[in-house]
Amino acid sequence: RRPSTLDPEALGFMCGLEIHQQLSTGKLHSRMPSKLFDIGIDEIPTDWQRRERRLRASQGESGRIDVAARFEAKRKRSFVYVQSPNSGLIELDEAPPLSHDKEAVDAALTISAMMNAKPLPYLQAMRKTVVDGSNTSGFQRTTLISTKGSIETPAGSVGIDVICLEEDSARKLDTQSTNSGEVVIYTLDRLGVPLIEIATAPDVKTPEHAKETALALGMLLRDTRMVRRGLGSIRQDLNVSLACGDRVEIKGCQDLDWIPQIIRLEMARQIHMFLLANELREEAGLPPLPSDRRDDNKPIENRVSRAAISRIPMVLHDVTNQFTNSHSTMIERSLASGSSVIATILPGFSGR
């Protein structure tokens, strides 16, 4: 079926939004100005210093190393940080962070009041592991400001689960392949710029309602006159699920007009994967997936998992030679840096 003809209500559609908006205040944990420099890799002034680093994954408070962090560490990339005039020792992770910028906190509390959210009595910065190089410290600082708010839209009220203040990441300028591995170059002008993060409840009724909700949130933020304007200053992340699928987060939607179509394409993808899974299960003589994943039967799914392991041998083959004439820049760079292309056979899939 065409994505435009799908009925959200009949399919058990659920959707929520996460809005990330830059504030027009100073940086969140340093007293540096939040100025962005419109320069590319070939325009960096010669007097801007550079620092080269490597990041290594370490145990968090749980005593375990994050899976994503371990994966990034295995890539053995190095990072070069260009020190812009509005970055200092804190941005370089060579000095401890300062307390929250007062104007940024005031903006977050103002936005909370406009959404009837309930502020927390204390502000406690939390740390989220980030080892892709976009944070010199290896983590992003996030502070929960308020909870349990709401915003009115043409299709009804949408709950606001949380409002947070967090640091924006460093801005990537280039990725280069060298004999010793991949080198990623960042500029520190954007690192530490305060972001207001607003996460809605899954109260969005339709793909079109998602656009209306994003528009209402954007207009409310602009009314504060405390937010930055322009391309890249706001980002919408979409959380979408159907009864027959899993929740999927679609990151970085910049254009509001794209939101309904992006969501409908994700709905169609989840339906396609559901039908394909049941087609493969039928061929293997296995029970089908229920149309509502909340009705999943754990013993049955364990049986399906064991059957899949026995049917798919997961024998790996090096097919790097088949990609030596690829026109993909990403593949060319990867092969030049010593990477390989690995493939496995999926019996019974027939190219599906």
Predicted segment positions?
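Basic, nucleic-acid-interacting segments
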Residues: 1-352
